[in-house]
Amino acid sequence: MDGLLIDSEPLWQEAAQESLEGLGVTIDDDLYASTIGLRTRECLEHWFTHFGIDHVLIPATDEDITARVILKVEKSGRLMNGVIKAMDLMEQLGYRIGLATSSPTSLIKKVLSKTNLEGRFHAIASAEFLPFGKPHPQVYLDCAMSLRSIPSSCICFEDSFNGMIAAKAARMKCIVIPSPAAAHKSVWGAADLTLASLDDLTKETLLRI
């Protein structure tokens, strides 16, 4: 969802930095990028270990960051290029569309409301309360089950390395649409296809993959 449907990764990074400033640390771009696709608490576990911060502060920091992101999405959240076009195309071809995300339910509701995508998904699965989030495949498997689809018949769209690994671990096809800052990295080899934008998705691509 984040970075694929809505341009919210910069908002997450801003929120995380604002929250962690109170703890006296700064998250650089590389450290932040290494955790894209993970649940917030797992990002915090990684960051707190890196900086030597007491993990007892994770739950409160998790809540603070999520609250900040929800406010930022309400204020300035916008759809990524090609989202509506891609969803229209998939609906025309008879695909059932699911949303499998690491984001919490509170943010999912805000994003769908803000972007007028409510009602466009046949299934929604959040890793919020799962034992493991991405790169574990469970959230994708749960979404496939809700769609009444076998995993190998599903096509996933991802913008993160952790999400791509989750999709492939679920034995699904995966189209990656990395951010411009990550597109040059040599980590996308497991994907079935790489696109610059959802604007580039075509009927031929979907039928061929």
Role assignments for model-derived ranges:
Residues 19-20, 39-54, 111, 144:
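Helix-loop "lid/cap" segments that line or gate small-molecule binding pockets
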